[in-house]
């Protein structure tokens, strides 16, 4: 669904949202009821869910990576449970970043596997138990908030500060995966990433519900490569505008942009077109880490293209320096209470 999200979802509600309101009401009733009434199975490990309210990009992957790094810094061994969107594995699979390709396991799991063990499975309990058998002592659930297939001790919902929740309507009238009120009831804290006022409404709703609100920024770790150069920036992610703005914030001049569908599988013609466009205008080519991992594991991609392609790597930085540790502490404390309660 994320790759097919129509642009009108992110604008003020119009006639299309109104026309789809009956279908959205039905979808919302079903998804909201499932979310509220579900009693997900539990595993004997602390579980942090990193999710979002909508389809499309919000910053879940860098958030999951930040928590994996934070857990490792505390002497823990985190494991990540993922569905592997964009891949084709239907059973349990441990991601091998040295051999797996994005078309088989998905781009996000490949990125995550650089930082922690990643188990793919539609059965999230089975994936978590498998990670436990490998010695993992802390589970990060990448997405899965609405699926209710694994109990989370703490659910952190990520929202983009400039994009927010779009028109605030439920699929198919808007990007919400379930009614916001139902999702907020199951939310433990909100993480707002970036600058802007697009998320003001959901921040107010979280505050009214008494949910903690954290703020963070995506900082480029490759500014030395990006700054002072003119770029053709391209991306096949849920929110490409966030990437283009990150290139600018890193000091690059974005002259041209080319947006593809989320999790897009590039074709040879796409690569030739990008190279020709950049050459004609004397621009460098830059893309996201997710797009790069897809391109790097695709058969037939020219090595010279990959060698000249710049990648914008970003790290998540909380505005409050103690925020990450506080959330990790809360997850572990809730797990202990669950275990002994």
UniProtKB/Swiss-Prot annotation:
Binding site for ATP: 54-61
Enzyme class: transferase
Catalytic activity, reaction form: a lipid A disaccharide + ATP = a lipid IVA + ADP + H(+)
Domain of life: Bacteria
Record-linked InterPro entries: LpxK (IPR003758), P-loop_NTPase (IPR027417)
One cellular component term from this protein's GO annotations in UniProt: plasma membrane
MF-aspect GO terms: ATP binding; tetraacyldisaccharide 4'-kinase activity
EC numbers, comma separated: 2.7.1.130
Record key words, sorted: ATP-binding, Kinase, Lipid A biosynthesis, Lipid biosynthesis, Lipid metabolism, Nucleotide-binding, Transferase
Pathway as given in its UniProt record: Glycolipid biosynthesis; lipid IV(A) biosynthesis; lipid IV(A) from (3R)-3-hydroxytetradecanoyl-[acyl-carrier-protein] and UDP-N-acetyl-alpha-D-glucosamine: step 6/6
Record SUPFAM superfamilies: P-loop containing nucleoside triphosphate hydrolases
GO biological process: lipid A biosynthetic process; lipopolysaccharide core region biosynthetic process
NCBIfam families: lpxK (TIGR00682)
Job of this protein: Transfers the gamma-phosphate of ATP to the 4'-position of a tetraacyldisaccharide 1-phosphate intermediate (termed DS-1-P) to form tetraacyldisaccharide 1,4'-bis-phosphate (lipid IVA).
Family the UniProt entry places it in: Belongs to the LpxK family.
Designated name of the protein: Tetraacyldisaccharide 4'-kinase
């Amino acid at each position: 669904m994320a790759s097919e999200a129509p642009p009108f979802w992110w604008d003020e509600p119009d006639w299309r949202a109104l026309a789809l309101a009956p279908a959205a009401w039905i979808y919302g009733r079903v998804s909201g009821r499932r979310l509220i009434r579900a009693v997900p199975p539990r595993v004997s490990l602390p579980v942090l869910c990193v999710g979002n309210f909508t389809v499309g990009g919000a910053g879940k992957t860098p958030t999951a990576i930040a928590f994996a790094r934070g857990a490792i810094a505390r002497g823990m061994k985190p494991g990540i449970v993922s569905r592997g969107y964009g891949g084709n594995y239907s059973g349990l699979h441990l991601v091998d970043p040295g051999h797996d390709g994005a078309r088989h396991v998905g781009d996000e799991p490949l990125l995550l596997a650089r930082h922690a063990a990643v188990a793919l499975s539609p059965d999230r309990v089975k994936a978590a138990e498998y990670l436990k058998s490998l010695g993992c002592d802390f589970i990060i659930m990448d997405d899965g908030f609405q699926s209710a297939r694994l109990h989370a001790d703490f659910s952190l919902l990520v929202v983009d500060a400039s994009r927010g929740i779009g028109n605030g309507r439920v699929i198919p009238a808007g990007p919400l995966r379930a009614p916001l009120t139902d999702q907020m009831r199951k939310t433990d804290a909100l993480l707002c990433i970036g600058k802007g006022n697009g998320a003001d409404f959901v921040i107010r709703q979280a505050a009214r519900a008494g949910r903690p609100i954290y703020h963070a920024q995506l900082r480029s770790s490759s500014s030395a490569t990006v700054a002072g150069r003119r770029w053709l920036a391209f991306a096949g992610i849920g929110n490409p505008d966030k990437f283009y703005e990150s290139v600018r914030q890193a000091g690059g001049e974005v002259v041209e942009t080319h947006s593809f569908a989320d999790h897009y599988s590039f074709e040879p013609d796409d690569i030739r077109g990008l190279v020709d466009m950049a050459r004609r205008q004397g621009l460098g080519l830059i893309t996201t880490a997710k797009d790069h991992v897809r391109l790097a594991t695709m058969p037939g991609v020219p090595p010279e293209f990959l060698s000249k392609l710049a990648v914008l790597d970003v790290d998540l930085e909380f505005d409050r320096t103690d925020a990450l540790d506080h959330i990790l502490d809360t997850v572990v404390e809730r797990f202990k209470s669950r275990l002994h309660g």
